[in-house]
Swiss-Prot record:
Bias type Basic and acidic residues, positions: 105-129, 140-153
Lineage, broadest ranks: Bacteria, Pseudomonadati, Pseudomonadota, Gammaproteobacteria, Alteromonadales
Source species of the chain: Shewanella amazonensis (strain ATCC BAA-1098 / SB2B)
Sequence similarity: Belongs to the ProQ family.
Protein name stated in the entry: RNA chaperone ProQ
Xref: InterPro entries: ProQ (IPR023529), ProQ/FinO (IPR016103), ProQ/FinO_sf (IPR036442), ProQ_C (IPR035236)
Encoding gene, per UniProt annotation: proQ
Amino acid sequence: MESTEKLTDTNAILAYLYETFPLCFVAEGETKPLKIGLFQDLAERLADDSKVSKTQLRVALRRYTSSWRYLKCIKAGAVRVDLDGNPCGELEQEHIDHAQATLKESQDKAKAKRAERSKDEGDAADKAPRKPKRKPQPQARRDAKPAAKDKPKAAPKAPAVPINLVPAKLEELKVAQRVNVKLGMSPVAGSIVDINKGDVHVQLDSGLTVKVRAEYILL
């Protein structure tokens, strides 16, 4: 004899009721108010059905009748039905008032939970470490000139040059020779680092290297 698997999940039991009693239990859309004492009828009709137990049927029925969809159908003029969809009398005002109060309470609780969840998410976002804002520089610092360390070093003063310097001849010059270069009004001391044809490369004492013709070299 094949054993029948018992349904334990409430959603699966509701799906079974939708299929077995489609005129009573509505899967989608507007539901119908159920007959008072329907659980007893349901237990008797499914007494030999090994798929469901009375306990699970009670849980499934409670979920069905506490849903917003069901509570909204409890209104004036609605008629209760039995397992086969047969009418079993109109709703009493007391039951309508109770259903509306239950619906409002449930919706208010859901709204409060959503608000609390949004607040918690907002608090979590506020507590998350944020990148510190860059402190604005004072106007005086923004307008200040670059630091002295970024400037090229001032050229040291050239040593006093004798007044009897004369232009050199190319053949008199050699690498590493100390010479003076005529730059502007005053000669500047330096050392020859290279001689290429008629051009003489001189590294001045300031660190600057210049290329001049031999006639600008003073000895």
